[in-house]
């Protein structure tokens, strides 16, 4: 809200579209680049049309700003900006989600040597993300079954991803593990969560490698990225890999700003910097 207020005060029109499947029929296709990008570009065009019908004229210039899944969406909008047939000026992405497969694998490795309660926290986060992935896949493949990814004991929790957001899912996975810990001698040994090698399931693999990964094609407009060194939700390693892969296909990252922020403070600590970035990319008229 602080960012939006400051952008409005600077003279910008702010459009905040929601994602497909949130507040509309159907399942939300979590971290689907194309879905997010279409939501944004359609919203920008619709907003300009709405304002012009009321004799409120706006510039054809526009930028995207987003944090976390919103940062992921902002990068997707950069790829599909030409759909709007306007004048796209650039992207500011804060802790943008990417390389979810790597995040899941690295999380499992980290949990392997962690204490039981650290394991619980890590596993709950990983399983909440995985549940949202499966729900998103079911948007276009309704026959896809949670049991192809989860075990019987966790699939019932994962199904909640079709109606709940990340935090409630996290809480449910965590609570179930807590009961197991309390009744199994303070250990998670023997607790089964996901099917072996589920990331090799074709629909999951396609999602992780292709559908969810931003900047797989060259983007020629400016890109500014903020990343927290203490971020455990979108680790710096994931963003480093995103930038490396983007550079390989010819995309230039104009600025990569890092600091001692976690996932939330990467955004809250940089509101004024982001407003300044927007003014640089698209000076107010």
Region spans (language model):
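Cap/lid segment of the alpha/beta-hydrolase catalytic domain
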Residues: 1-38
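Loop/turn elements at helix/coil->beta-strand transitions in domains of secreted/extracellular proteins
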Residues: 9-15, 58-62, 86-90, 219-222, ...
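Alpha/beta-hydrolase active-site loop
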Residues: 30-53
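Primarily recognizes the serine-hydrolase "nucleophile elbow" in alpha/beta-hydrolase
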Residues: 46-117
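Accessory cap/linker subdomain of secreted extracellular hydrolases
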Residues: 97-216
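Acidic catalytic loop of the alpha/beta-hydrolase fold
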Residues: 100, 229-234
């Amino acid at each position: 809200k602080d960012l939006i207020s400051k952008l409005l005060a600077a003279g910008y029109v702010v459009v905040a579209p929601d994602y497909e499947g949130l507040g509309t029929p159907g399942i939300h296709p979590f971290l689907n680049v194309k879905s997010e990008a279409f939501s944004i570009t359609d919203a920008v065009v619709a907003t300009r049309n709405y304002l012009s019908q009321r004799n409120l004229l706006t510039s054809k210039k526009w930028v995207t700003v987003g944090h976390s899944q919103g940062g992921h969406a902002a990068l997707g909008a950069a790829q599909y900006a030409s759909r709007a047939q306007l004048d796209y000026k650039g992207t500011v992405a804060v802790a943008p989600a990417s390389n979810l497969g790597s995040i899941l694998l690295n999380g499992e490795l980290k949990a392997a040597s962690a204490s039981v309660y650290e394991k619980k926290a890590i596993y709950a986060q990983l399983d909440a993300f995985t549940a949202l992935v499966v729900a998103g896949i079911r948007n276009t493949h309704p026959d896809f079954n949670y049991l192809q990814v989860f075990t019987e004991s966790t699939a019932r929790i994962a199904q909640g991803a079709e109606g709940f957001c990340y935090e409630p899912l996290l809480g449910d996975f965590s609570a179930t593990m807590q009961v197991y810990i309390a009744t199994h001698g303070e250990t998670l040994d023997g607790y089964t969560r996901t099917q072996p090698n589920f990331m090799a399931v074709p629909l999951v693999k396609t999602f992780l490698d292709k559908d969810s990964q931003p900047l797989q094609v060259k983007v020629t407009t400016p890109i500014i990225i903020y990343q927290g060194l203490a971020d455990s939700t979108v680790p710096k390693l994931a963003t480093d890999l995103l930038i490396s892969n983007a550079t390989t296909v010819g995309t230039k990252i104009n600025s990569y700003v890092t600091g001692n922020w976690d996932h939330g403070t990467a955004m809250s600590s940089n509101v004024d910097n982001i407003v300044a970035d927007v003014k640089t990319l698209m000076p107010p008229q």
